[in-house]
A protein has these predicted regions:
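Transmembrane alpha-helices and adjacent helix-loop boundaries
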Residues: 1-213
Length: 213
């Protein structure tokens, strides 16, 4: 097109669409970004569920100890878990990403994995409270019934308590997945090449924001 050429609305619309998606196969950059976004979300959710489950079990087990039978080691780990959830839930995700990428993993160039790790650690703090709430929502009589049948504490938790808690926490875990999916856009600030990163790159080349975003 010549400089200053006047385009109709339809021509302008198609030209901007062509620039953003078809020119130089730019649509492939979006596909790559979507793949990275889903990968980061899956890794972060897996880490968050594992970490959150461990933290929740430690805290629930500590809280259910009988008076006079407190375990010092369990008390220490419970305190660590409380500090972890308080700090992670009380600081912005952006700050956590910057600390992980510029301080802890300052020499790493794998920004996608650093982003996934950070999101997973962040998610773990929230998932732990979701799972802890689900475990505490189970009728205490269920634990007493399991123990009266001769099952030890861990067996009762695995066989009786946790299966009931899972049903209660599934909707909240679904919400956490959606939140993680949206939060992946933040890893752009540390160089993670997800969907927003791809869109920004194309926007910087075409000087057009509507279609890339």
């Amino acid at each position: 097109l010549n400089s200053g050429t006047k385009l109709s609305f339809g021509q302008d619309f198609f030209f901007k669409f062509y620039q953003a998606f078809l020119l130089k196969d730019r649509w492939m950059q979006y596909i790559s970004g979507v793949g990275t976004t889903l990968l980061v979300t899956a890794l972060a959710l897996a880490l968050g569920v594992v970490l959150g489950s461990v933290v929740a079990l430690v805290r629930v087990t500590h809280d259910q100890q009988r008076p006079g039978h407190k375990n010092a080691v369990l008390g220490f780990f419970n305190a660590v878990c409380q500090v972890y959830t308080t700090i992670i839930r009380g600081t912005p995700m952006m700050v956590q990403l910057l600390i992980m990428s510029m301080v802890i993993f300052a020499n790493s160039r794998n920004f996608t994995m650093v982003g996934a790790l950070t999101l997973g650690i962040n998610s773990g703090a929230y998932v732990s409270e979701i799972i802890r709430g689900g475990l505490m929502a189970v009728d205490p009589g269920q634990m007493e019934a399991g123990r009266s049948l001769g099952l030890n504490y861990m067996t009762t938790m695995v066989v009786i308590i946790i299966p009931q808690a899972i049903r209660a926490v599934l909707p909240a875990l679904g919400n956490e997945f959606i939140i993680l999916l949206k939060d992946t856009s933040l890893i752009t600030v540390i160089g993670g090449k997800e969907l927003l990163y791809a869109a920004q790159g194309i926007m910087n080349r075409t000087y057009e924001a509507m279609f890339p975003l």
